[in-house]
Every structure is written in C-alpha cells, then in structure tokens.
A protein has these predicted regions:
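Cleavable N-terminal export/targeting peptides
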Residues: 1-35
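Short glycine/proline- and aromatic-enriched beta-strand/turn motifs that initiate or cap beta-hairpins
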Residues: 23-84, 210
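Outer-membrane beta-barrel architecture
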Residues: 58-64, 99-104, 136-140, 172-174, ...
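Conserved binding-pocket/active-site segment within a compact domain
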Residues: 136-142, 147-176, 183-186
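Residues that define the transmembrane beta-barrel architecture of outer-membrane proteins
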Residues: 51-59, 92-98, 129-135, 163-169, ...
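Transmembrane beta-strands of outer-membrane beta-barrel pores
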Residues: 40-48, 77-85, 96, 104-106, ...
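Repeated loop/turn-to-beta-strand initiation elements of outer-membrane beta-barrel proteins
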Residues: 30-38, 65-75, 107-116, 143-150, ...
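Outer-membrane beta-barrel "beta-signal"
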Residues: 175, 198-211
C-alpha cells in the first residue's frame, strides 16, 4: 500500500501543479457560473478472508453550483487493480470505469444537513463490460473547517450483469485546508445485496482542489 500511495502521490503532485495554471484559474467565467474543482481519490479495498485486494485511483473534475437545483456535477475516471488469491495462485485484473454523478445538498439549519447523490457509469474489464449505478444518502455535519458524514449507498447493475449489486455503509471526516484545499477520509463496508454476506472493507483518501 505504501508503494502504491507513493506512486499516486507523484501523480497528485503533477496534476496539482498543472491545475494551478492560469488557464484553469480563469475557468469559472466559462463554465455557466459553476465553480470548478478537481479531486483525486485513492482507495484500498480488502475482502474479509484476505484473498481479495483492490487498489484504485479516481480522477474527479467537477462543477459546483452552491445555489442551483443540482449542487454538484462530477465526472469520474477510475482505474482499478484487482488481485485475487486462490490456492496460492494470484490473479490480477485491470478495471477501468467512467461515470457521471450529481449531488443535491439539503440543509437542516445550523451545522447539520444531508446530501443525495446519484451516479450512472460503465465498467470495462478483460472478461466483461457492464453498466452500473448507485444512490447515496448521507447525514452531514459541518463546522468551520471540519466535516463528518455517515450514510448508505445502494449500488446495482443496470443491465443485469451479475455480481455487482452491493449495499454499503460509509462514514468519515473531512477537513478544509485554507480556501482551496480539502481532504476527505472514508471507511466503507460493503455487503452483497442479495445474500447479505459481507464482501469488503475499504479505506478512502480524497484530495480536492477548489479553484
């Protein structure tokens, strides 16, 4: 995991420097009034029995509309490296995904609120291609630079491809670092939507630059 994070960290540094160029700093005036953001998400997922391990990196260019009917539009570009061990034999698989996601924020007053997100995406593996989607519902607390969410995700295959229906529980803190930077940490537990067997636990680190 350390080597993986090191490689991803170098990618993050290069992209952060590129994002600082004046071309992107002026993008807000060209994007229908939305505020551009760019995120990088690193995830490690492990199966309960230790036979499965997945590392992934996701690039997330986004437009944020604080007062719009939809508050956020994300494009997710994902690259996964999946490793399965069976009887001592290790099989590795590369998975690529592309998805669109929207988010609506709902405020309760004070520091409390919630959000609803919906995603549709397409996944490509050496053995199959499938369409999938999910819906997130999360309770959110925000005070000054600190935030915390706890919520659920319902994920389903959209074309009947088996093996991709999951329910997830997600929680973790976030930290605003100055005006332009945000760090999010998430812990996720996933269950098979049909058998209710626990499938995986994941840890996620996401960095977002706000233009």
């Amino acid at each position: 995991m350390t080597n993986t994070l090191w490689r991803y960290g170098r990618v993050l540094a290069v992209l952060w420097m590129a994002a600082s160029c004046s071309l992107f700093a002026k993008a807000e005036t060209l994007l229908w009034g939305g505020h551009p953001e760019f995120g990088i998400e690193l995830e490690e997922e492990k199966s309960p029995d230790g036979t499965g391990l997945t590392h992934s990196i996701t690039y997330i260019p986004a437009l944020v509309f604080p007062n719009g009917p939809i508050n956020r539009f994300d494009l997710l570009l994902m690259d996964e490296r999946e490793q399965e061990t069976t009887d001592g034999v290790v099989a590795k698989t590369n998975i690529t995904k592309v998805a669109l996601r929207v988010r609506k924020n709902i405020r309760f007053g004070g520091d409390w609120g919630m959000y609803v997100r919906a995603l549709v995406g397409h996944a490509n593996t050496p053995s199959e291609r499938y369409n999938y989607g999910y819906t997130d519902l999360a309770l959110r607390y925000e005070h000054d630079f600190f935030g915390f969410i706890a919520g659920v995700r319902v994920q389903r295959s959209l074309d009947g491809t088996p093996g991709h229906d999951r329910n997830k529980f997600r929680l973790g803190p976030s930290f605003d670092i100055g005006e332009h930077h945000e760090l999010e940490f998430r812990w996720v537990r996933a269950w098979d939507a049909h058998t209710h067997a626990r499938e995986a636990d994941a840890t996620i680190l996401e960095y977002t630059y706000k233009f």
